[in-house]
Amino acid sequence: MASSKLLKERIESIQDTRKITNAMYLISSSKLRKARKNYQNVLPYFTRMRDTISRVVPHLPDEPVHPFFHERQREDGDPRRAYLVLTADKGMAGSFNQNVLKLLLEKADRNDRFYVIGQVGYRALRKDPRLVQEFQYGATAPSLQRARDITVDAIDDFKSGKLDEIYLIYTKIQNALTSEPVMVRLLPLDREHLQPAPRGLGDPRGEVELVPDAWTVFEQTAPIYMHGMIFGLSLIHISEPTR
């Protein structure tokens, strides 16, 4: 039978662990509130940006097809894909990171490229020859400029024909207990998906004038829209591994 001294030490150890756990909970709750507040603050901007793009798309010419909509077909039938993978900078998240990485490896082929955000993803894939770029700072402190840094090279390679498709893989949070890995296509864009919503009664939107032309305006705004997707998801993403 354990002595009273050992029992006392065990009780004290459990109490200390509880204090640490409570402190971690308070910190993570604060980070979650801050991240969600930041997301809500920037959401109107990116909503308006998407609305702007959807109003430009109908004015684009059918020919030539803008590169962002170009569905390429290679002779070998093997498209060159890039995957932007959003993971955490910490590993205390159970399946949060593992499910994202599992989905990546299930979908990727040998000729694909990986652009990894977060230290966990980098550590898991650092020996994989398909890893071409990593952003270990991107998960902890996301910003619009960092989101641009993450996407600009992949977008340039798509426009030049080095890449045929670009995908984003991240964790979609359903609620406090449920999440799932999700893969969405960034490029080529789906023209039908970007059509403007029908204008209702009292809609303040008027006719749009595109200067110098629709092609140029779309060329400038579409990358910003994609940067915003990365940034917005990152704001929510950073709070989850410490919840």
Where are these regions (language model features)?
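C-terminal beta-strand-loop-alpha-helix "lid" module of Rossmann-like NAD(P)-dependent dehydrogenases
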Residues: 1-235, 239, 243
